[in-house]
Amino acid sequence: MAKKSVIARNEKRKRLVEQYAAKREELLKAGDYEALRKLPRDSSATRVRNRCVLTGRGRGVYEKFGLCRHMFRKLALEGKIPGVKKASW
């Protein structure tokens, strides 16, 4: 499980991206890079990390499900993810 502070930091970044999205778009279209540079760094979408919603793990996350590979496998084998079953051919 990831540290709670790391998860909280990522959530803060998500909020900032949402808050400044319109302003960033407007400044990019205008080409005003000086004003864009003065915005908070964490308001850039590239600083947000996809994390597992259950464990907070930052690597091996399936974006479609929002789960890391470990939790995805565990829940899929338990039959808790609808429409997902183990491959067999």
UniProtKB/Swiss-Prot annotation:
GO annotation, cellular component aspect: cytoplasm; small ribosomal subunit
MF GO annotations: rRNA binding; structural constituent of ribosome
Highest taxon of the lineage: Bacteria
Keyword Acyltransferase in record: no
PROSITE patterns per UniProt: RIBOSOMAL_S14 (PS00527)
GO biological process: translation
Keyword Hydrolase: no
Keywords on record: Ribonucleoprotein, Ribosomal protein, RNA-binding, rRNA-binding
InterPro entries found in the cross-reference section: Ribosomal_uS14, Ribosomal_uS14_bac/plastid, Ribosomal_uS14_CS, Ribosomal_uS14_sf
Assembly: Part of the 30S ribosomal subunit. Contacts proteins S3 and S10.
NCBIfam families xref list: PRK08881.1 (NF006477)
Function comment: Binds 16S rRNA, required for the assembly of 30S particles and may also be responsible for determining the conformation of the 16S rRNA at the A site.
Family as reported in the entry's similarity comment: Belongs to the universal ribosomal protein uS14 family.
Protein name, per record: Small ribosomal subunit protein uS14
Organism of this sequence: Chlorobium luteolum (strain DSM 273 / BCRC 81028 / 2530)
